């Protein structure tokens, strides 16, 4: 499974599931640069180049892959000629974008702006060619939404810095970065690369496109809507200056969109860096003081992972990521007693597969064994609730192999479902092998397979 697929499936439970990279939307922002993986970067970014058949076919494939819209193809056959002419003439007007508020794991909401499928197609075509031109100039320490780069690489590089003796981290997150993007500053940066005024005007129109929610339209003078294929690339262009400044100062860092971890050798160096870099950043952006800190790496998380305190630090799954998986499992195993365990396992399977696929890098496996046991206990608890009456429980325990006396004693105890789900009688009656036959996967075994 590719990293973008794993992240999309894991968002609900991994700690990145706050809407920043929603399934079917953030994948569209990962730039596919051409057939075979490369685009001719020497082609200037003009409107005519953007709407060539080659680029449009690549963009179309990407949009459809990411759950674009089944009706796109017939619509294009009927209307593309007029849209194409409007693009060439420089007077194409993007449609309003749909607002979607996604709850953040730590409270509040993240606002997405979802363009129409046609505008996603056009944005993707622009992003493909623009990426081919600018990506080669980006920092090697920038990992978010770039061809051939992913979160796994960022986490592994962070681990190498820590093992190399940089055992303090300046964990810096920009506050409401996407909501506060200065349009003038971004367009100035883009004008250094894009000389075709039609393309620049179109990007500005996308930045200023109205947001619609509940039939109400909202105009915007700042910010960059998350949810379209252009947004991640534009964020990298805007934050490239920060990367270059950190490189100029000789710092070891990993940045993934607006999350930036800078690794230093001492608290003193970290205090000095935090003060100076905050002054640099806040000339144009704002540091999120609540989420930014100088700390030991094992006290923080980065892209859902953390590390152990050992000299040869090991990657582990951050506690918040574990807790969010548990929240997702709880939501699927409680509240609907009529749903069979088999159906519940079927609903759990894609969540568990996506989660462990993303967290395959963990070197601390004890938590996976604990989670496997906890998930089975949740399912035993579901069974106990579904059996409801002591008589039904007695019959089912007997059918599972318990003696009549033991089944009756167990069924008529005064303890609640959770206590019973962890008791010896339920563990003996509903063995681990039974869950395997129902299709439940083991996180521990899945992770071991990834390591083979």
Language-model features, listed with the residues they occupy:
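Short, solvent-exposed helix-loop connector elements
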Residues: 219-224, 313-314, 330-344, 354-367, ...
């Amino acid at each position: 499974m590719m990293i973008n697929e794993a992240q999309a499936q894991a968002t609900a439970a991994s700690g990145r599931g706050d809407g920043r990279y929603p399934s079917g939307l953030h994948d569209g922002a990962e730039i596919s640069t051409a057939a075979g993986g490369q685009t001719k970067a020497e082609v200037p970014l003009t409107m005519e180049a953007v709407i060539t058949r080659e680029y449009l076919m690549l963009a179309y494939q990407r949009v459809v892959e990411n759950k674009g819209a089944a009706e796109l193809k017939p619509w294009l056959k009927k209307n593309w000629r007029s849209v194409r002419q409007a693009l060439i003439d420089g007077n194409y007007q993007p449609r309003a974008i749909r607002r979607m508020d996604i709850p953040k794991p730590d409270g509040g909401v993240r606002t997405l702006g979802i363009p129409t499928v046609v505008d996603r197609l056009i944005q993707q075509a622009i992003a493909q060619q623009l990426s081919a031109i600018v990506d080669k100039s980006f920092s090697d320490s920038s990992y978010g939404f770039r061809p051939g780069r992913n979160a796994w690489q960022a986490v592994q590089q962070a681990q190498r810095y820590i093992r190399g003796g940089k055992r303090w981290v300046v964990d810096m997150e920009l506050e409401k970065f996407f909501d506060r993007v200065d349009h003038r500053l971004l367009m100035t940066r883009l004008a250094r690369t894009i000389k075709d005024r039609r393309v620049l005007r179109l990007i500005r129109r996308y930045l200023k496109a109205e947001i619609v929610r509940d039939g109400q339209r909202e105009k915007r003078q700042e910010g960059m809507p998350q949810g379209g294929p252009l947004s991640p690339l534009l964020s990298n262009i805007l934050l490239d200056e920060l990367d270059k400044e950190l490189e100029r100062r000789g710092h070891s860092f990993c940045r993934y969109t607006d999350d930036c971890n800078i690794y230093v050798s001492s608290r003193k160096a970290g205090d000095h860096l935090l003060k100076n870099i905050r002054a640099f950043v806040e000339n144009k952006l704002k540091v999120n003081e609540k989420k930014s800190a100088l700390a030991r790496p094992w006290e923080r998380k980065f892209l859902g992972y953390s590390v152990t305190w050992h000299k040869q630090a090991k990657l582990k799954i951050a506690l918040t990521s574990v807790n969010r998986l548990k929240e997702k499992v709880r939501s699927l195993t409680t509240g609907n007693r009529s749903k069979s365990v088999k159906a519940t396992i079927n609903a759990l399977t894609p969540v568990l597969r996506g989660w462990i696929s993303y967290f395959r890098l963990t070197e601390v496996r004890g938590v996976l064994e604990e989670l496997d046991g906890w998930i089975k206990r949740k399912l035993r608890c579901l069974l106990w609730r579904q059996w409801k009456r002591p008589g039904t429980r007695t019959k089912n325990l007997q059918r599972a192999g318990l003696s009549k006396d033991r089944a009756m004693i167990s069924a008529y105890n005064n303890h609640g479902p959770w206590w019973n789900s962890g008791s010896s009688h339920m563990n003996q009656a509903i063995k681990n092998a039974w869950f395997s036959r129902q299709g439940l996967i083991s996180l521990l075994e899945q992770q071991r397979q990834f390591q083979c």
